[in-house]
UniProtKB/Swiss-Prot annotation:
Residues 160-179 are annotated as: Disordered. Coiled coil: none annotated. Belongs to the BPG-independent phosphoglycerate mutase family. A-PGAM subfamily. The gene is apgM. Keywords: Glycolysis, Isomerase. Catalyzes the interconversion of 2-phosphoglycerate and 3-phosphoglycerate. GO terms for biological process: glycolytic process. PANTHER family: COFACTOR-INDEPENDENT PHOSPHOGLYCERATE MUTASE, METALLOENZYME DOMAIN-CONTAINING PROTEIN. Its EC number is 5.4.2.12. This is 2,3-bisphosphoglycerate-independent phosphoglycerate mutase. It comes from Methanosphaera stadtmanae (strain ATCC 43021 / DSM 3091 / JCM 11832 / MCB-3). InterPro entries: Alkaline_phosphatase_core_sf (IPR017850), ApgAM_prokaryotes (IPR023665), Metalloenzyme (IPR006124), Pglycerate_mutase_ApgM (IPR004456). Pathway: Carbohydrate degradation; glycolysis; pyruvate from D-glyceraldehyde 3-phosphate: step 3/5. It catalyses: (2R)-2-phosphoglycerate = (2R)-3-phosphoglycerate. GO terms for molecular function: metal ion binding; phosphoglycerate mutase activity.
Amino acid sequence: MKGIIFVIDGMGDRPVKELGDKTPLENARTPAMDKMVEEGITGIMDTIRPGVRPGSDTAHLTLLGYDPYEVYTGRGPFEAAGINVEVKPGDIAFRCNFSTADENLIITDRRAGRIQSGTDKLAEVINNEVKLDDVEVIFKESDGHRGVLVLRGNGLSDKITDADPKHEGNKPKTVKPLDDSEEAKFTADIVNKFVEQSYELLKDHPVNIERIENGENPANIILPRGVGAVPHVTPFEELYGLKGVCVAETGLIKGIAKIAGMDTIDIPGATGGIDTDIDSVHKYIVDTIKSNKYDFILVNVDGADEAGHDGDIFGKRDFIEKVDNIMADLKDMDDIVLFVTADHSTPVSVKDHSGDPVPVFIKAPGLRVDDVKEYGERAAAKGGLCRIRGTDVLYIIRDLMNVTQKFGA
């Protein structure tokens, strides 16, 4: 029996007027998931706790059975691990965005038009030409508009704020120390210099000149956020006795899995957006499940989250329908415990994560089937699982896999 957590990233939402006051999930045609819901058990989940807006990083740590309040140091180290950038003790790592700024350094597009090519050339300039007071700069492009920055040197601290303003129409935030240490003050100054230099180096780069000529937003500034040092995470297999693998599109999710000691699968053509090669994603998910190499599989598809951040109502709904085609192959598998969920809600009206609980369902042999017939936020709230937390998920899955021990005599 295999355990599978299938995360449709950012799927949860709120009723949308344009969809007849339904959510994108409720409005989507999802016959495969509806069938599994009819034969399974449903509920809603607060990944962290009610009202807390989870990051994708803290949400996935929780789903894998870790307490993010204990092991989470910041997003950066996980992003770095996901693209094989080493973070040594003493280093600090950041998740970065390739973004667009105008001549006054006002951020006009935090994701530089969802840039998909040319970032390797921009990263090369950053690595070769940024100079920061005896601090080594290691910068690497990730998928799409994402990148990773590692700073290496003496006297660095992760007790600093972000440069990313999180919303367009603002200048990059001035990075500030979070304590009175000289290390934090020094590091904040270093990161501010990095942001300034990134703009000067990238604004006239040939990649960006070409993008402007093509009517595309230039990727002319780097915005670091989510700083963290190396986290201390007990390997997943050591904790739970399950050999695990992660099939995901983005570096963040693969990085979390790698730091947890799990194997990862790279998917050709996967972008982490609604334009991803869904057929390739489909193939690699199904092939991994059928491989019989693993006891536990974490799956993440990211397009619904991207659409939520962009406020793309119909793009989000349509992507959910594409994911349902993948589910059609899982529907008839008998030897799996399948837990389908979102890691958080990303309402199109908010264009960011929210604290709304997410809909979940379980497909497994011998379940106590409830009366819910379709997959949606409000339907799932009537299900037999009731309202659970992310910390409950692995307990439930492992119990249904029959690999747990009795608590007590």
